[in-house]
């Protein structure tokens, strides 16, 4: 894989709380952004997406920029997260995939054999539609508002490819891992350049940070994660690390994997709501030393009302500070422990951001 270079045109941020926290500096306020902050919780999102498929919208520069910016305008979050989907790199590479309403990504042809792996297209270059959208986004963001890019981690993409779509148990995926490990490792290795080139495209266009998102890693044992997944996520984060921008690593239900995942090399570790932040920090620091924490409000608590919401936010902030004071963490970025739920009231998200910033 060719060496990556730092884009000469990358903008200079000034007092950007997300980036300061990610770099272990003291931010001007508690930084916050929410996974899936751009989406169905916003009426303006539903309006602009009407009649346009999810994947198509990810390849329309003006539309993806508008959707990315909507929550920044409305909620005063400290970062925009690029509106996209984890299967966008697959579609850009030429893989037949659609996002089916009510189900999720569905592949035209599952990958089940060594021949299937060898025939899987690789994303060789940049994604111009996404780069154009990023340019539009950066024109509106202030120099204190970060733009976070992202990509799906190789295990999650591999699971979609092997299962042919979403799976409750990932039985075909695990069967390939253990029953045909040679094919499994070949598939993971083949996904690496597609993911790296997707992130490279975003970085070339000017993103300020990135997140590697492993939706399904929580279904794995630590042993399986370490043997079958970690080497490939590590390779991706190492390649992106040459760009010298903050890297966030997050997986759902990964409390028992935090130590193993931290070995992949990100500066920031995302934590879901099932693990107290100070305990998560201990698990991470014991393996990889202190890192910046991201998280970890239960998305359902956005429905609870101001008083209980405030109590939970204060608890999470206190846990983060406990971890920092103990030398187990170097900073904290507030986020949910997963994505914003589609039926969340937009005004409740705005209120949560205000409480976090206060």
UniProtKB/Swiss-Prot annotation:
Enzyme Commission designation: 4.1.1.37
Alphabetized UniProt keyword annotations: Cytoplasm, Decarboxylase, Lyase, Porphyrin biosynthesis
Predominant location: cytoplasm
Residues holding substrate: 36-40, 85, 160, 215, 338
GO molecular function, one term: uroporphyrinogen decarboxylase activity
InterPro entries referenced in this protein's UniProt entry, alphabetically: UROD/MetE-like_sf, Uroporphyrinogen_deCO2ase_HemE, Uroporphyrinogen_deCOase
An example Gene Ontology CC term for this record: cytosol
GO biological process, one term: protoporphyrinogen IX biosynthetic process
HAMAP family: URO_D
Matching NCBIfam families: hemE (TIGR01464)
Self-association and partners: Homodimer.
Family (UniProt): Belongs to the uroporphyrinogen decarboxylase family.
Chain's role: Catalyzes the decarboxylation of four acetate groups of uroporphyrinogen-III to yield coproporphyrinogen-III.
Protein name: Uroporphyrinogen decarboxylase
Species annotation: Corynebacterium glutamicum (strain R)
């Amino acid at each position: 894989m060719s060496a990556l270079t730092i884009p000469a045109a990358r903008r200079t941020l000034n007092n950007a709380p997300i980036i300061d926290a990610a770099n272990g500096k003291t931010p001007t306020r508690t930084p916050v952004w929410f996974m899936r902050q751009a989406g169905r919780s916003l009426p303006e999102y539903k309006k602009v997406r009407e009649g346009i498929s999810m994947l198509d919208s990810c390849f329309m520069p003006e539309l993806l920029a508008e959707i990315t910016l909507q929550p920044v305008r409305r909620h005063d979050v400290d970062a925009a997260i690029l509106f996209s989907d984890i299967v966008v790199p697959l579609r850009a590479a030429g893989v037949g995939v659609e996002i089916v309403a009510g189900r999720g990504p569905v592949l035209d042809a599952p990958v089940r054999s060594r021949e299937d792996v060898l025939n899987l297209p690789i994303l060789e270059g940049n994604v111009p539609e996404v780069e154009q959208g990023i340019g539009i986004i950066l024109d509106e963001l202030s120099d204190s508002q970060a733009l976070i890019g992202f990509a799906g981690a190789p295990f999650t993409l591999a699971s979609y490819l092997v299962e042919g779509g979403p799976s409750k148990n990932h039985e075909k995926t695990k069967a390939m891992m253990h029953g045909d490990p040679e094919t499994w490792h070949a598939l993971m290795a083949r996904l690496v350049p597609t993911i790296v080139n997707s992130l490279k495209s975003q970085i070339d266009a000017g993103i300020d940070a990135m997140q590697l998102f492993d939706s399904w890693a929580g279904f794995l044992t630590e042993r399986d994660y370490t043997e079958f997944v970690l080497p490939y996520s590590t390779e991706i984060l190492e390649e992106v690390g040459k760009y010298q921008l903050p890297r966030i690593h997050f997986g759902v239900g990964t409390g028992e994997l935090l130590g193993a995942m931290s070995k992949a090399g990100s500066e920031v570790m995302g934590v879901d709501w099932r693990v107290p932040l100070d305990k998560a920090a201990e698990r991470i620091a014991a393996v990889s030393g202190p890192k910046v924490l991201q998280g970890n409000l239960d998305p359902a608590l956005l429905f609870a009302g101001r008083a209980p919401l405030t109590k939970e936010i204060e608890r999470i902030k206190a846990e983060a500070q406990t971890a920092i004071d103990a030398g187990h963490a170097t900073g904290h970025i507030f986020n949910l422990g997963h994505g914003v739920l589609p039926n969340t009231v937009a005004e409740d998200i705005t209120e949560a951001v205000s409480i976090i910033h206060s």
